[in-house]
From Swiss-Prot:
The lineage of its organism: Bacteria, Bacillati, Bacillota, Bacilli, Bacillales. It comes from Bacillus cereus (strain ZK / E33L). It is an enzyme of class 7 (translocase). It is found in: Cell membrane. One of its GO terms (molecular function) is ABC-type D-methionine transporter activity. This is Methionine import ATP-binding protein MetN 1. Its EC number is 7.4.2.11. It catalyses: L-methionine(out) + ATP + H2O = L-methionine(in) + ADP + phosphate + H(+); D-methionine(out) + ATP + H2O = D-methionine(in) + ADP + phosphate + H(+). Belongs to the ABC transporter superfamily. Methionine importer (TC 3.A.1.24) family. SUPFAM superfamilies: ACT-like, P-loop containing nucleoside triphosphate hydrolases. Residues 2-241 form the ABC transporter domain. Gene3D superfamilies: 3.30.70.260, P-loop containing nucleotide triphosphate hydrolases (3.40.50.300).
Length: 346
């Protein structure tokens, strides 16, 4: 559906050349929600603006719907862009016209017939649950409502791809969740492919199927959201995953606890998150776990949780208990045993 092949972007400044993208390649499958996450300056905004050639790449190929956009004429590119919708952090609504006209005007300029415009405006305002505000002006809307209008406007061209450039970063947490729910609904009901960029792990875990992590203009890790959450490899990826779990254990406390036992992180995914495996292990083996922190969050279609525990007992019994937990589908990290990577506490 979307494929970037060795895409680079170099900006020329007074101080010299700045390489915003470094030979980046990735694929987005038809119908999926693909997220790109990274800190400020990682290159994610440049990347997403290259997808519809708002930024022309210095090198590489951008293939959307089996068309290499970098080879198209101006007229051909304009036509191809009609199948690529885009929403932004800043909404970009016309302040002097109504909600209805904000959606209808671009369709009019594109030569869509009047009756079809009326049909589409109503259809997509109903999808974003704002048809009753069609005669309102942007100044009369909340931030979340403005973003819903922007989404309806993008959808009114009936694109096959929707690009989201930090579309929720200016919104409060509750409104962010409502916009994410709307994007997920659109993806599932309309089947539109969504490529989004964000610096918030909450966005990734709520609606994405797959994710790429960017740093210094390059993709440093990618995979399914489940893979990234349960087995992050790069230190930056680990920081993003840990940001989804608020609890932090002070270094002094860790040091003191490690004198009398092992500090272990247990990660649960899907069905295993509901199993009383820890309780069973406590009864079956001579171990005494003390829960230091815990959190359960929801990925797109399944639960994911973490428990940080202080496990006391004879080493042999602790080893057996941790092996048992692994057999139950629980990911075991940390401690003095060789059960996985060193756990990070934030």
């Amino acid at each position: 559906m979307i494929e970037l092949k060795n895409v680079s972007k170099v900006f020329t400044t007074k101080k010299g050349n700045v390489e915003a993208l470094k030979s980046t390649s990735l694929q987005v499958k038809k119908g999926e929600v693909f997220g790109i996450i990274g800190y400020s300056g990682a290159g994610k905004s440049t990347l997403i603006r290259c997808v519809n050639l708002l930024e022309k790449p210095t090198t590489g190929n951008i293939i959307v719907n089996e068309q290499d956009l970098t080879t198209l004429s101006t007229k051909e590119l304009a036509k191809a862009r009609q199948k690529i919708g885009m929403i932004f952090q800043g909404f970009n609504l016309l302040k002097t016209v109504t909600v209805y006209e904000n959606i209808a005007l671009p369709l009019r300029l594109a030569g869509v017939p009047k009756l079809e415009i009326e049909k589409r405006v109503e259809k997509y305002l109903r999808i974003v649950d704002l048809f009753n505000r069609k005669d309102a002006y942007p100044s009369e809307l909340s931030g979340g409502q403005k973003q819903r209008v922007a989404i309806a406007r993008a959808l009114s061209h009936e694109p096959e791809v929707l690009l989201s450039d930090e579309a929720t970063s200016a919104l409060d947490p509750e409104t962010t969740d409502s916009i994410l729910d709307l994007l997920l609904k659109i993806n599932e009901e309309i089947g539109i492919t969504i490529l989004l960029i964000t610096h918030e792990m909450n966005v990734i875990q709520r609606i994405c199927d797959r994710v790429a992590v960017m740093e210094h203009g390059a993709v440093i890790e990618s995979g399914t959201v489940k893979e990234i959450f349960t087995n992050p490899q790069h230190v930056t990826t680990k920081k993003f995953v840990n940001s989804a779990f608020a609890a932090k254990i002070p270094a002094e406390v860790q040091k003191e606890l490690q004198r009398t036992g092992e500090i272990v992180t247990l990660s649960f995914i899907g069905n295993s998150s509901g199993e009383p495996a820890l309780a069973i292990a406590t009864k079956r083996f001579q171990v005494y776990p003390n829960i230091l922190s815990g959190n359960i969050t929801q990925l797109k279609h399944e639960a994911y949780g973490k428990l940080v525990i202080h496990m006391q007992g004879e080493k042999n019994e602790v080893d057996r208990a941790l092996s048992f937990l692994q057999e139950q589908g629980i990911i075991v990290e940390g401690g003095r045993t060789d059960y996985g990577k060193q756990v990070l506490f934030g």
